[in-house]
Amino acid sequence: MSIWDRLGDFIARVSSSASSGVADVVEAVRTVFSGDPDLRRRVAFSVAMIALSAKMAKADGIVTQDEVRAFQEIFEVPPSETRNVARLYDIAQQDVAGFEIYAQRMAQLCGSGHANCMMLEDILDGLFHIAKADGLIHEREGQFLHRIAEIFRIDEAHYEAILSRHVNLGAADPYVVLGIERGKPFEEIRKRYRKLISDNHPDRLIARGLPQEFIKIATTRVAAINAAYEMIERGLRHA
């Protein structure tokens, strides 16, 4: 049985309750998949992305076809499960609980309990990918994403690194892309670079619960990291 079959069964169970909300969704993920940690992580990532995408759309007030396509780049949903994914999306969008409560619950569900948790950074990265799909991150979307980062305990340097990959602010600052302060010794820069490359290896991404489709998006992340490191290395070599 694929993850989408399991996720479809789960969503059908949650949506059958008339009072379904974030508390029901989170508790169901914890209990239904408690015996399979790997599957639980994959379901948790999918649920967080779907629910927070819905909340972002509600905050922005509009969903464009470009954003729908961007979502489909992260998740290749089988036609048989499209209805169930739409159910979860609707639960989140119609729930009176605000997006901050959703973000807090998703952080508890997906996070490690530490600042700059990689899985939560992946979720934020995915939300940026969707938000920028229509060519512009609107003001409300930007405010939403920054607040999500705060709730996820993603510090400003890591947030700026994610932002720099999605928003064209002119020539990207390579130090911002790597999330490291300018002026640090080259050994620290190289150590940071190697950690980023290791964290973004496909095996690591899958282990964190990311779907196969997300790995294609992560290649853009790795390309930006490589380019930033090469730029710093060249600059220091000619200094």
PLM feature spans:
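Small-residue-enriched hydrophobic alpha-helices in membranes
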Residues: M1-K55, Q65-A239
